[in-house]
Amino acid sequence: MAQTINLQLEGMRCAACASSIERAIAKVPGVQSCQVNFALEQAVVSYHGETTPQILTDAVERAGYHARVLKQQVLSSQQTEDRKPVFSAKLVTGLVISAVLFFGSLPMMLGVNIPHFPHIFHDPWLQWLLATPVQFWSGAEFYRGAWKSVRTRSATMDTLVALGTSAAYFYSVAITLFPQWLTSQGLAAHVYFEAAAVVITLILLGRSLEQRARRETSAAIRKLMGLQPQTALVKRGEHWETVAIAELAINDVVRVRPGEKIPVDGVVVAGNSTVDESLVTGESFPVDKTVGTEVIGATLNKSGSLDIQVSKLGQDSVLAQIIQLVQQAQASKAPIQHFVDRITHWFVPTVIVVAIAAFCIWWLTTGNITLAVLTLVEVLIIACPCALGLATPTSVMVGTGKGAEYGVLIKEASSLEMAEKLTAIVLDKTGTLTQGKPSVTNFFTLSPTSTEESLQLIQWAASVEQYSEHPLAEAVVNYGQSQQVSLLEIDNFQAIAGCGVAGQWQGQWIRLGTSNWLTDLGVTGTEHQPWQSQAQQWEKEQKTVIWLAVDTEVKALLAIADAIKPSSPQVVQALKKLGLSVYMLTGDNQATAQAIADTVGIRHVLAQVRPGDKAQQVEQLQQKGNIVAMVGDGINDAPALAQADVGIAIGTGTDVAIAASDITLIAGDLQGILTAIKLSRATMGNIRQNLFFAFIYNVIGIPVAAGLFYPLFGLLLNPILAGAAMAFSSVSVVTNALRLKKFCP
């Protein structure tokens, strides 16, 4: 059986580094798959056989990088922060020295004589002295990275920077040591110490800014982790004590006062309140909580005090599972990333070849070694595989994190990419378009009774039904509670299978059941036209009719059905506006299915479908060329969810359905479908923008650096500009990805 492990990686500088690690792990016997996420600095490895985590980390170490096993535990938000300072001592040193060198080189770069300029800065020996610590101390990480690539027979961005800056530095050293000889050969005795130092400093600065921006891409995870309270008020004997969350056990009872966060998942055993679940589930309205209802840890108790019996802790909690799913999605790769990986694998070697070719061409055609060295340095420095490597994962990280904020959990990056391409969506009726449980939809009484008299009938009905365990009885009780009636103590309760229930209140018999049963008991009015007409109308709508009689007289009718969710019609119309063909899937007969479909605005109805045939219906739509999403919540929906190109599970459904899905809507609100599709389109659009920026930057920058326009316009980049452009490219890609944080469905 295959196992999956997450590794935290250190030492990666660019996408080529990620490719090197991926290849190193893939060579380990027993490894089935490996995905390295450069932006997240993590690897997800599936393996079997005798392979162990230690063998995998050793493989990473041999490749020249560091790895440690990530334990699946919920960390505090502070622990997820990157402790590495944005402005390190090496960067500050580089900034100070580079500023001095740049200032000293201004007259040469501008080609003018500046009066009263301190000419000591022109001294190549001083420039050499100043540039050396930047080259070999501030820039030491580039040399270490380049040496790793030599050992592993690969090439990374560190290779390019080390080669480029070394060429400028050692060329300048040669000019400083042998100026007369070079001048006698007709070569310009210009040094480029400032170029080497400034390029290293700019790249270090770019990496620091990039690191800071990348930290923002994981803000959603830190926000989720920060929701978890650290302490709870727990009952110990006859006393209440404040303890750390880690000290709680299953079945402990905790008390949550108004305005406090609920510390754990559990069941209310005393009290009632409203709870704000928006930060966890995306549900915008407070949810009523009474005895017997479940609560989610990290949600906010609003109005009343609640005593909660702990049911889940640690990794079993809803919040922990949400965090784990978001991390899983952020560590995964979108299919488009595999295309980028193939390019970055050959990118650095290609750039080195182009740089050498530019050097040879300009030296052979002009005999100008300075020009040849400059083009070599500029090509090596301006090329940037980092921008390519960051283009996709940064957008995925922000997009999946944003989805979690709206209660949309995306398991894999591939689901984001596929959701953008959807052409059809299949909605299971029960539990998706409807509430998934019976509820009273209509109450009818013949005589013109007052509101008080109607409420009394509802109170009697709910009071009798409270003693029954039948699902229809629960619907009547819930209806009574929604009308805010209190339940009475009923005497002589009776339940007759297939007929109904009865009980006495103050000597009166109250009966609820079928018309035939009431007729057999001598109740009058069951055959009267007004009652029969209303009952027949509801039965045509596939509603269950319950007759309410007091003593020997019919008093009211109740209709019970699986009510349509209020948001269903609106969501269906919105899906159509997004260009999707909407289908309803149900086991109901055609007439019943069509009535519900007409109510919510669905034209395509797949009725009388047996549970085992749902996946086949999805497959038939796929065979017609559709990219299909399936939305469901039940066990019998799991095969169809797995068959669909994108399976979307309603979070209020079964664990089996959620496990088989690609996207989970935590709150169970259909609005989450729209959020998921709109988010996928926004994320994929952002990825394409990033890839365009990264590709166009390299496609234009490398030829310009190689001197393509020099013969026509005398245009040749300064190495400093090349370094600045390279640093800016990565920062711009990450900054563009951060725009997704403003996404609003």
Curated annotation (Swiss-Prot):
Predominant localisation class: membrane
Subcellular location: Cell membrane
GO process annotations (BP): copper ion homeostasis; copper ion import
Keyword Chaperone: no
GO cellular component, one term: plasma membrane
PROSITE patterns reported for this sequence: ATPASE_E1_E2, HMA_1, HMA_2
GO MF entry, a single one: P-type monovalent copper transporter activity
Reactions mediated catalytically: Cu(+)(in) + ATP + H2O = Cu(+)(out) + ADP + phosphate + H(+)
Binding, Mg(2+): 633, 637
Coiled coil: none
Active-site positions on this chain: 428
Membrane topology: Multi-pass membrane protein
Alphabetically ordered keywords of this record: ATP-binding, Cell membrane, Copper, Copper transport, Ion transport, Magnesium, Membrane, Metal-binding, Nucleotide-binding, Phosphoprotein, Translocase, Transmembrane, Transmembrane helix, Transport
PANTHER family: ATP7, ISOFORM B, P-TYPE CU(+) TRANSPORTER
Protein name, as recorded: Probable copper-transporting ATPase PacS
Organism in which the protein naturally occurs: Synechocystis sp. (strain ATCC 27184 / PCC 6803 / Kazusa)
Gene: pacS
